[in-house]
From Swiss-Prot:
The keyword Transcription regulation does not apply. This is Cellular retinoic acid-binding protein 2. Embryo. The lineage of its organism: Eukaryota, Metazoa, Chordata, Craniata, Vertebrata. Keywords: Cytoplasm, Endoplasmic reticulum, Nucleus, Retinol-binding, Transport, Vitamin A. It comes from the Eukaryota. It comes from Gallus gallus. InterPro entries: Calycin, Fatty_acid-bd, ILBP. Belongs to the calycin superfamily. Fatty-acid binding protein (FABP) family. PROSITE patterns: FABP. Transports retinoic acid to the nucleus. Regulates the access of retinoic acid to the nuclear retinoic acid receptors.
Amino acid sequence: MPNFSGNWKMKSSENFEELLKALGVNMMLRKIAVAAA
């Protein structure tokens, strides 16, 4: 598996909440993450 560690800048947050949901992140953490993004 490639090493993806490092600094990343978010280019867009389109469907970000759906991605978090698919990854199994609970609703409260998703709302916080989307608000911060």
